[in-house]
Amino acid sequence: MKKKIKAFLQRIINWIKKNKIKSAIAFLLLLIYYFSIPRTLFKEPYSTVIESKEGELLGAKIARDGQWRFPAQDSVPYKFKKCIVYFEDEYFYKHPGFNPGAMINAFKQNRKAGKVVRGGSTLTQQVIRLSRKGKNRTYFEKIIEIILATRLELGYSKNEILEMYAAHAPFGGNVVGLEMASWRYFGVQSNQLSWAESAVLAVLPNAPSLIYPGKNQIKLLSKRNRLLLKLHQEGIIDKQTYELSIEEPLPQKPYDLPQIAPHLLQRAAKNEEGTRVKTTIDYALQNRVNQIARYYYNQYKQNEVHNLAILVIDVQSRNVMSYVGNSPADADHQKDVDIIDAPRSTGSILKPLLYGAMLDDGELLPNTLIADIPTQISGYTPQNFNLTFDGAVPAHRALSRSLNIPAVLMLQDFSVNKFYEELQKFKLRNINKTPDHYGLSLILGGAESNLWDLCRTYANLSSTVNYYTKNKGQYRTNEFTELNYKNDFKPDFGSETNQKNILGAGAIWLTYNAMEEVNRPEGDEAWKFYDSSLKIAWKTGTSFGNRDAWAIGTNSRYVVGVWVGNATGEGRPTLTGVTSAAPILFDVFNLLPRQRWFDTPYNDLAEVEVCRLSGYLAKDNCPKIKQWVPKKGKSTKVCPYHKTIHLDKTEQFQVNSSCESIDNIVTKNWFVLPPVMAWYYKSQHIEYLPLPPFKEGCEGTQTTTMDFIYPKANSKIYLTKDFNSNVQPVILKVAYSERDKELFWYIDDVYKATTKTFHELPITPTTGTHFITVVDASGNEIRRKIEIVRE
């Protein structure tokens, strides 16, 4: 056998040597034949298609040439495969690309009819013809198709050729390909088609005009039923299936494509136009979140609030589970705008990041008292949402109640530049101006961000705690990674390290504990009394002018972000994070499986003694409690508010050794806040006791315990008029710790009034600069310089 093969090869070599020109021509022809099929047979643009992680269609965008042409599927459904082969090319699996018998029969019939009545082309030839669209149907073109068809058969399997045909065959109008046709005419995926539906689509490429609703129904029905009969006669379908199939009605009207995640489709089309993207979207969850969005849209539009967005993230993988980029509004209300990526004013949504950064840096402890008093800093006057003051609030309560004044004072202590650098590490893209541009308003909505970046930030923080507690106090170098919506993408979280990325696990955990204390939305106030209630860390935000309502929440497995407002930026009086965004947040969380709370990251915490009243590290004269704090918290300030005072035996008066014998002096530790803080604090805390007055004869030793509440130093005050054009008075206020004692008021060193108990004085001064002096009975005084301006 080997000798015969060797002899045969030798004869070929000898022939080539004798016939060099013929050999060269033959080689050239073979080369042309080999390269006659381009690597990419079809160059048509495709629709952008997105699918859920389960493979369900979420939406599609028309191709650039105006055709609905889906990218080819991995396989052709069995029913359609049988239908198309038995209808178009019964010998498909036997021929080399063309069928001589079918061609001869077609030639005879066409010649007899005097026109083309039968093509005789195989499915392989039809694939070639579809790829060479626009070519005239001549016998010369037919020869080219035959040659190319044989080459196609050599390079591709029969199943691959069927896939090409199914993806590019015309199905009427601008519908191209089986998958699009199954959605357009039957509203289902191609693998869900019945035998009757598959038969309809098998006959359509042969005569696409038959599909127009209400027209040619008899012809289409006849073609379909003949094919079904053939399938029955060939044993492909049984008698019962055949009889049931011929009773199925023909499609009467086209179906709309699913639009389950239209804004995610926009996002995918920007990055991967003309491809099929299998996403990480959970199909059932997406549909239910869409229902929630529709429900609240129908409610909110009655108050002229037309837009909202919802994003659900899996913390462990950073995968997007649900993506609702906007409400189902109409074109007049910017329904096509993807709010998830749109920069909007942050409101209070950045407060947890400041709180966490200060904990992590050892600048405060969870219970550290923060001032909540009238505040003016270089002309900037922050106000709490409820326009009240608490005097002093524990830092964690200031966060959970979203108080603005404590947040501004915290930022002032931490510094705008330092906090800005922290935010840059989180890669909040829209915070892109200088720190000086934002100033202290950075913490109250002076900056912009978007739902995508904020949800990513909280997902990364949550994952930091999870990994740290489950891996013996280790972090990962790439923990702060991007969110992902593509199912085939696997994030790289880097290698283990003992160095934190941005915030330590302890600071994050304590921040989440504070966020978990937030009061639930209206109608759900009793949530904390039920064991089965959701335990999540969440934060709301409302921008200036009620233009943006935010709510972002997280547990150990999921992050949910919600934005509500108008894409135009129009504000509405009732639009707030708590009343508008938070209800959506909790409805979405109710769709998700319950999760356990974050494990405590003990390796990143230290137990210390703190003052029970001030929240600072405890001094010897403080009432003490133990508390877990970040390790740097061991170096924070000690309590500045506890003082040791001396009282007489009745403990009603302060004394000293100059006016009381040492044997009669009682020493006590007393919690003393600065005058303005104390003035507001005592109205919220009936247990707060101001310092006892000095016993008569000891007054000279006391220090001043009064301060201005209003005005602030060097204030510029504008006098306003009422509706009757009368100038409104300015109300001066002073906090004074001595109960039932008098204060004497002077304007420009001229006595004006005496006040007792409530130290307020209305004045209507002239324009210009004035000096206000307040003196108590012991001669202690405070002064303020103000400038009066009339509007």
List the predicted regions and their residue ranges.
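Active-site SXXK
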Residues: 55, 83-85, 231, 289, ...
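Mid-domain, small-residue-enriched loop/turn segments at the edges of structured enzyme/sensor domains
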Residues: 381-384, 415-456, 471-479
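Soluble, non-transmembrane domains of envelope/secretory-pathway proteins that act on or interact
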Residues: 17-20, 490-496, 535-791
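Short active-site loop at a secondary-structure junction
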Residues: 68-73, 304-307, 331-353, 366-370, ...
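Conserved catalytic neighborhood of penicillin-recognizing serine enzymes
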Residues: 112-137, 191, 254-269, 364-419, ...
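Short, well-structured active-site flanking segments
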Residues: 93-102, 176-179, 239-242, 335-336, ...
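Juxtamembrane regions of bacterial inner-membrane/periplasmic proteins
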Residues: 2-303, 315-321, 326, 373, ...
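A penicillin-recognizing enzyme superfamily signal
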Residues: 279-300, 312-314, 323, 330-342, ...
